[in-house]
């Protein structure tokens, strides 16, 4: 099981008028949940930036790879969220900040589904924090 969740979407900087502003200003409390429990729970997560990275990865990903490795422009820490091929179509899910050891790999399909659901929800819930032009651009990148 893998779930990418968020709540309390906000933008302390106001309405994003440019793409880079949407990537970094639209934040939420973010949680990665796996079978064992909460792998990662972070406030002020750049949800739009992660959605764009996931959308780009989904365009090229298959059961064999490549791995997904997310590092935010807003943080020096690398590997804030990653998915790595493990064996027999299974993938490991982790983070540099993970709160527990994730011993149960996820299927590629579970990861795809979790990423798609996350992107879809970000598209809906972040629109009010972007200008119409930026929202259209973000929608086309993540489509």
Protein language model features and the residues they cover:
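Mixed-charge, glycine-accented linear interaction segment located at domain edges/termini
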Residues: 97-143
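An exposed acidic His-Trp-rich patch
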Residues: 68-106, 110
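N-terminal low-complexity, intrinsically disordered segments
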Residues: 1-48
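A short, compositionally biased
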Residues: 23-29, 65, 85-90
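Charged, low-complexity, helix/coiled-coil-prone segments
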Residues: 1-3, 54-67, 128-138
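Compact, well-ordered interaction domains used in eukaryotic information-processing assemblies
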Residues: 43-75
